[in-house]
Amino acid sequence: MQTLEGGALRLSRRHMLRGLALTSAALVLPGHRAVAAPGPRQDPETTWRAFVTGLPKAELHMHVEGVVDPWLAFELAERNGLRLAHASPAAFARTLTFDSLESFLRGYGQMLDVLRTGEDFHDATLTYLERARAENVLYAELHFDPQAHVNRGIAFEEVVDGIRSACASAERDLGIGSRLIMALQRDLDVESARAVYASALARRDDIVGLGLDNYEEPGFPAKFEALFREAAAEGFRLTSHCDLEVPDSVEHVRGCIELLGVDRLDHGYSVVESEALTALCRARGIGLTACPTTDWNHPDPLEDYYVAAVTRSVGRMLELGLRVSLNTDDPGLMGGRYLTDVMVDTRRALDLGIDELVTLSRNAFESTWAPEEERRGWLAALDAYVDDRAPAVPG
């Protein structure tokens, strides 16, 4: 596999994050126990944040394209000779206010446009993995949208090589594992999906699963049923976005489970509206990857209507015993908020305790598509961390 490490852009923020990832005393690797350095007495929220930062975590729902924030967008645009329609990164950030899936996807398209080369994909991926590792994320499954790039003339292989090169570097240097999920766009025709699926078959060792995202068209599960059944027969794991407050959302969840045979649901909040679907998700152990994320223009995320709605759903999923986890979705677009921020805000909104936070992290590890041996190691690290750190956290 072609590597891009030697020519990769060295971003100033990257060196800072690498230092955090390699030196933070809060980080825990499987087989090690957490050691908390003594310090001054902290207020409860600071103590909670420290606990969540060091908590061993996995992330199952983030998009490589969504890692690009306004500052990285300007750096990549300059490297690629592009001119952005904003005076500065801060001015760009002020435009990233989302009140619908459509407004979000417009912002997403602007970030996507600056990704032009394998080196760009490498740098975006490594930016995420370094930041995630600094927050003790031990493993991540990274979504990428090849149709959006192939349709712009970028080769499938260049995209995958760039992402995989960063994943290999991060695993070697930082100890964070990762695998790829190829997302297909629900609003494009099946022939387009089949074209990139054929490319994915040739990279079977690099891509663990298939998903569906982008605009949620009516009846989309039936549209992709045949392709998903073929993918399952080839050994791919399966997921699909099922978004909040769209028409027929409950039926889409049902179709994803019954027609597509998904192992996980990305978002999937409507499952709590149906006792039958709730029971089905519990029986099949289907993971639900919740993303209570906001934009750059909400100083307090809990004041965002979307965050409030998703957070309520997360609380209900926990009550119902569903395998729900917390995720960042698109941290570059979503106010630069990574997994610690999301977990801390969810704890604050729902008044969660240690048991619920550990359950969310455990659900994430148990929902991964990694080998059982790897999962056992991460869960052991989680248990060791809780044994060491839980007594110091406010009740």
Regions found by a protein language model. Give the residues of each.
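N-terminal secretory signal peptides
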Residues: 1-12, 24-26, 35
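Sec-dependent signal peptide recognition
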Residues: 18-22
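Hydrophobic alpha-helical segments of integral membrane proteins
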Residues: 28-30
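Signal peptide processing junction and immediate N-terminal pro/mature segment
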Residues: 32-38
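Short linear motifs in intrinsically disordered/low-complexity regions
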Residues: 6-7, 33, 384, 388
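N-terminal export leaders
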Residues: 13-17
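Metal-cofactor-binding active-site regions of metalloenzymes
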Residues: 39-238, 244-251, 255-264, 270-287, ...
